Amino acid sequence: MRVLGIETSCDETGIAIYDDEKGLLANQLYSQVKLHADYGGVVPELASRDHVRKTVPLIQAALKESGLTAKDIDAVAYTAGPGLVGALLVGATVGRSLAFAWNVPAIPVHHMEGHLLAPMLEDNPPEFPFVALLVSGGHTQLISVTGIGQYELLGESIDDAAGEAFDKTAKLLGLDYPGGPLLSKMAAQGTAGRFVFPRPMTDRPGLDFSFSGLKTFAANTIRDNGTDDQTRADIARAFEDAVVDTLMIKCKRALDLTGFKRLVMAGGVSANRTLRAKLAEMMKKRRGEVFYARPEFCTDNGAMIAYAGMVRFKAGATADLGVSVRPRWPLAELPAA
């Protein structure tokens, strides 16, 4: 069984083909980073127009990469939400049109379920149950996962997501968009302990997050200490340490609450090397395991949508020919498979 996956929720156009016996057969990705760089963030209208230009050519490239033709595809999966409404509509329209033309089912996929299941693409996939840390530019959530579609929200950010805080703080430090990875690179040159940022909401019970205050703290620190290269690196280090420590503390609480021994990290920020190292060390001490996808599958991609579509297709999920998307779509609303 082969599923074509289409990802167009934000500023990456991702197309992939997944075979339930052979694994990933094709993976094509186009990033719009250069398109949005001058604006310091994603411009929704530009994102939608670029998806229109890139989606069909990438589908053709994926078919060529896999050596398949349209008649070899058994279902078409597409991201139906959450995300930018215009961008989502491009992928949904193309996906449903192809499904109709090829006479195969169309499978709407939840973007964050795609991220959550991305580690399943690896050679050593996690088994249920586990705690999932979904950490990206738009989401920071802790989820109890006991099966496909069996998701319980344990905590989430009440303001900025961790990835958003990374990008905003990077901009304060004069870094280009997207600044999160550049901030992490700068932080590697910083001196630990010169500046100490707060660990938000760790001094009270609960599993919710708040990262907007760290951006303000960074702005004040920059104002008071100048912007020479070493100072900027030291501020970046302090900021990253604060975010990573906060995420680690909350993960510990979630694992204690659930009693689970497995932790899954997913989303763009899960590619952060410092976060990976700290959580791996933490889970080793707890005699547990941590799982994450390879870096290219942490950010938005078609492979995770193709895989999630395969899982949902086997569970009987299909969509009619109407085109509808959900820019806001709580993960907990998904049915169990």
Curated annotation (Swiss-Prot):
This is tRNA N6-adenosine threonylcarbamoyltransferase. Fe cation binds at H111, H115, D300. One of its GO terms (cellular component) is cytoplasm. It comes from Escherichia coli O157:H7. Keywords: Acyltransferase, Cytoplasm, Iron, Metal-binding, Transferase, tRNA processing. One of its GO terms (molecular function) is N(6)-L-threonylcarbamoyladenine synthase activity. The gene is tsaD. NCBIfam families: gcp_kae1, T6A_TsaD_YgjD. Belongs to the KAE1 / TsaD family. It holds the Pfam family TsaD. One of its GO terms (biological process) is tRNA threonylcarbamoyladenosine modification. It catalyses: L-threonylcarbamoyladenylate + adenosine(37) in tRNA = N(6)-L-threonylcarbamoyladenosine(37) in tRNA + AMP + H(+). It is an enzyme of class 2 (transferase). Binds 1 Fe(2+) ion per subunit. It is found in: Cytoplasm. It comes from the Bacteria. CDD domains: ASKHA_NBD_TsaD-like. Its EC number is 2.3.1.234. Its cofactor is Fe(2+). Substrate binds at L134, V135, S136, G137, G138, D167, G180, N272. Required for the formation of a threonylcarbamoyl group on adenosine at position 37 (t(6)A37) in tRNAs that read codons beginning with adenine. Is involved in the transfer of the threonylcarbamoyl moiety of threonylcarbamoyl-AMP (TC-AMP) to the N6 group of A37, together with TsaE and TsaB. TsaD likely plays a direct catalytic role in this reaction.
